[in-house]
């Protein structure tokens, strides 16, 4: 049986990848780290935040060509991408049957013979992400697996319903069994610089989540500038967000490397100042295995290997898993299989 090597770092150094089989402990950040308790809104800090757009874009443009992992090393990184994936279905035609099939894929994301040959038996995705109405079927389908259900909430994707309804939706999803809540912020607060309103809204949503951990979706494609992205990231972390997330996947522009660089540097600055680790979730537009490799390399470079664990990193994705499975099969057999062999649901 073939065992995969560890995470490649700085071109030559290697660090061991461990896919944890204690699934619940591997995923829920409150079991590993003190939750981000938040801090009082510091408007002086928010006002000092800058984002050098040209420098960020130059750095991001160099990333795809700077790093290259091949063979066993690439397979190890791709298995890590699966372990930190929020396998997602957010379509208007979702049904309980589709969600059940997606959950079966979450339990067994790669063909058993492939995992056996890779020495990665026990590998699952990080979570399954669905609308509120699909939480109960997902919870039932994942029973005993340790894989948490994440629910999009708070008037997703626009987030423009009354606040009391958004908070009630969070409570309903938690009561139905969701252990992670992906909320959407009011973009107008960012665009008008109303940081107090954004902070208060985020704090109320965090409180409504209770023990479920909360991912704050910034909808970065609608925030106008990278400086707004950086400031919104900081305010949401101050208000207690466990994760910050790029996008709903419904915007015209979703996750990008410049946005990712901006957000993870905000995470690093917040950790340096407070000691709290906040997770990161890029979502939307990450459909190819090669894209996931670039994101993993960037996050490792900027935040370190601790942020490559499922409790601090997630990919919001649907089609990404199929491409990763095709790449792993090619690694083992030398041939690419047809896409229909790797259907999600």
Label the model's feature ranges:
Residues 283:
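Terminal helix/beta-alpha structural elements that buttress the NAD(P)+-binding lobe
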């Amino acid at each position: 049986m073939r065992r995969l090597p560890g995470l490649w770092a700085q071109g030559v150094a290697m660090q061991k990848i461990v896919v944890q089989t204690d699934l619940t402990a591997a995923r829920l950040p409150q079991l590993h780290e003190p939750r981000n308790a938040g801090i009082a809104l510091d408007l002086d800090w928010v006002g000092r935040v800058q984002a050098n757009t040209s420098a960020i874009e130059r750095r991001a443009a160099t990333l795809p060509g700077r790093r290259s992992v091949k063979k066993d090393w690439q397979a190890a990184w791709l298995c890590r991408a699966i372990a930190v994936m929020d396998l997602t279905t957010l379509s208007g035609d979702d049904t309980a049957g589709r969600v059940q099939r997606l959950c079966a894929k979450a339990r067994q994301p790669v063909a058993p013979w492939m995992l056996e040959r890779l020495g990665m038996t026990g590998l699952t995705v990080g979570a399954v992400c669905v609308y509120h109405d699909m939480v109960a079927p997902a919870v039932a389908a994942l029973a005993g697996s340790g894989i948490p259900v994440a629910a999009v909430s708070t008037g997703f994707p626009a987030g423009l319903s009354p606040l009391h309804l958004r908070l009630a939706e969070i409570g309903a999803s938690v009561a139905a069994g969701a252990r992670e809540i992906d909320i959407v912020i009011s973009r107008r607060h960012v665009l008008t610089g109303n940081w107090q309103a954004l902070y208060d809204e985020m704090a109320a949503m965090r409180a409504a989540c209770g023990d479920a951990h909360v991912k704050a979706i910034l909808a970065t494609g609608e925030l106008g500038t990278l400086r707004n992205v950086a400031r919104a990231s900081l305010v949401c972390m101050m208000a207690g967000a466990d994760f910050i997330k790029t996008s709903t996947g419904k915007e015209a522009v979703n996750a990008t490397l410049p946005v990712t660089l901006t957000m993870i540097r905000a995470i690093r600055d917040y950790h340096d100042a407070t000691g709290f680790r906040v997770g990161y979730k890029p979502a939307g537009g990450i459909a190819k295995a090669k894209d996931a490799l670039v994101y993993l390399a960037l996050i490792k470079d900027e935040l370190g290997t601790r942020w490559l664990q499922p409790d601090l990193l997630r990919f919001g994705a649907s089609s990404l898993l199929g491409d990763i499975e095709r790449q792993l099969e090619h690694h083992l057999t030398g041939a690419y299989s047809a896409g229909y062999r790797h259907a999600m649901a």
